[in-house]
Every structure is written in C-alpha cells, then in structure tokens.
Regions:
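Alpha-helical transmembrane segments and their short interhelical loops
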Residues: 114-187, 233-243, 247-250
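Membrane-interfacial helix-loop-helix junctions in multi-pass membrane proteins
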Residues: 196-248
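Helix-loop-helix units of permease transmembrane domains in multi-pass membrane transporters
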Residues: 94-126
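Transmembrane alpha-helix boundary and packing residues in multipass membrane permease domains
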Residues: 54-59, 137-141, 170, 219, ...
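Short, membrane-interfacial amphipathic segments enriched in basic
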Residues: 3-29, 208-218
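Transmembrane helix-boundary elements of multi-pass transport/secretion proteins
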Residues: 14-24, 28-101, 129, 145-157, ...
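Short amphipathic alpha-helical coupling elements at transmembrane boundaries
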Residues: 27, 31-35, 105-109, 210-214, ...
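Transmembrane helix segments
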Residues: 56-64, 173-215, 219
Length: 260
C-alpha cells in the first residue's frame, strides 16, 4: 500500500492511500477460499462426497447410466455434483450464517461494499471449483476417463451452471433464517444427488418422472456436461434450461435478498 504525506507543523505526516477496489475484492476472495478449505464441513461437501460418489458409481453396470464405459458418463455428473456442492449448498450455508451474525451488514459498510462482497464470493466459488475439477479429474483419469468431446462447450455449461446455482444459493441464504438455510440446503442437495439426474441421467428414470427431472437445473447441468464431454455437441436445450433458472435466481436475489 502506498502512502501520501501532508504538511503539518513539525514535519510530514503520512496519510495511507486507499486500496484499489480490486485489491480489496481479491483480499476478501483469498479469505473466503482459505476459510472454506479449512472448514471440515465444507471439505466434506466439496471434496469428500464427490470423490466417494466418483469411485462408488464407477463400478455400477452400464445399464444404470446408459453408456459404456461407465466412467465417461459418471465423471461429468460428478463435476455437476461438485458445482452444486460449492456454488449452492456451501455458498448458501456460509452466507446464511454470515448474515445471521451481521457479517454481511458489516462488510457492506466497509470499502469492500455489497458489490465487492458478492464479487469476492463469486470468484472464491470459481477458485474452489477449479480445485475440485483438478482433484476429481485426476481421480477420474486413474479410473480410465478419457474425454473426447468439447472442452469449450463444457466450460460454457460449467460457468452457466455455477451462476445458476450460486444465484439460487444466495436466494436461499438471503430469505431464510440460518438454521432453515442449513436444513433446506442439505435436503435439496441430498434430493438432487438421489433424484436430480446428476449421476444417473434423467432418461434412465421411469418415463413418468424423467421429463420432470429433465427440467431441474441439476439435470440440465449434468446432461449438458455429458453432451459436451461425451458427444462434443452444444447442449442447447440444457443451456436454455439453465438460463431460465439463472434468470429466476438472479431476479429472486435482487428482489428478496436481505442483508440482515
């Protein structure tokens, strides 16, 4: 940090210059990432559960996922699970308790500001996801994963899925009490893991509910990644589904999010 000086009787008095907005945001981002990686519950959500699901589901019959080799269909779904773990469940729980203890209101009155706080949260989510993808990618490669599709399309789906679930997580955290956010975020997470079309594609469910599952953002995210990584095609329908959910989430945050 640079310092400016002012003339007073008796000499020069240093006057610290204000840090740039981006420096403040990056400092908060580093704090958010460090806090998440040191939190046992967050590590369980972001690393342990996705890794366990990856190794466990890699042994299921190909009929479960409708594709062989199984690992090629499982890995994109586990990437989707990792995104939901970080951008939705982890973000909602952390923000909910920060809101309860007045951290959001306090940070909103500092040089970081509300926009800076949201920017730091968003960047920290992306950084943690990158760590997850490296960790899971290495594990999947050990199991034989060999993606032949389009990484460019996959990145588009990942960014859109992150924005979608982050907006939904913030909406949950900004409208409910911390305890309610904790309970509902975990219930939604477990529900999506089981019946959200994440690891097992929506078209493998009974016809009566497969169409409903395909409308969920979790299914759109996982199916979009499978289309990109396996077939190398742009998942237009899944992208539109995510865009709709993202727009709804952003609208809800702008309208109902409360800082205290």
């Amino acid at each position: 940090m640079t310092a400016r000086t002012t003339h007073q009787e008796g000499g020069l008095t240093p006057r610290p210059a204000a840090a740039s907005p981006w420096k403040v945001v990056l400092t908060q981002t580093a704090f958010e990432v460090n806090s998440a990686l040191r939190n046992g519950e967050q590590l369980l959500l972001t690393i342990v559960i996705p890794v366990v699901v990856l190794f466990a589901m890699s042994r299921v019959p190909s009929s479960f996922v409708g594709y062989s080799p199984v690992i090629d269909a499982i890995t994109p779904g586990v990437f989707a699970l990792a995104i939901i773990s970080t951008a939705f469940t982890g973000l909602a729980i952390a923000t909910g308790f920060e809101r309860r203890y007045g951290v959001l209101r306090f940070l909103g009155s500092t040089p970081l500001g509300r926009e800076g706080f949201l920017a730091a949260k968003t960047i920290s989510v992306v950084v943690i996801e990158l760590i997850q993808f490296v960790w899971l990618g290495v594990g999947a490669a050990m199991l034989g994963w060999d993606p032949q599709g389009s990484w460019g399309y996959a990145v588009i789906v990942i960014l859109l899925g992150t924005a979608t679930f982050a907006s939904l997580g913030l909406l949950l955290a900004g409208t409910l009490r911390a305890e309610g956010t904790l309970a509902i975020a975990i219930l939604i997470y477990l529900g999506l893991l089981s019946l959200g079309g994440i690891v097992i594609p929506s078209d493998r469910f009974p016809q009566g509910i497969s169409h409903v599952i395909s409308l969920l953002p979790s299914s759109a995210l996982a199916d979009g990644l499978r289309s990109a990584f396996i077939h190398g095609v742009f998942p237009a329908v899944d992208v539109v589904t995510l865009l709709i959910w993202c727009a709804l989430g952003i609208f809800g945050v702008r309208r109902w999010f409360r800082w205290s």
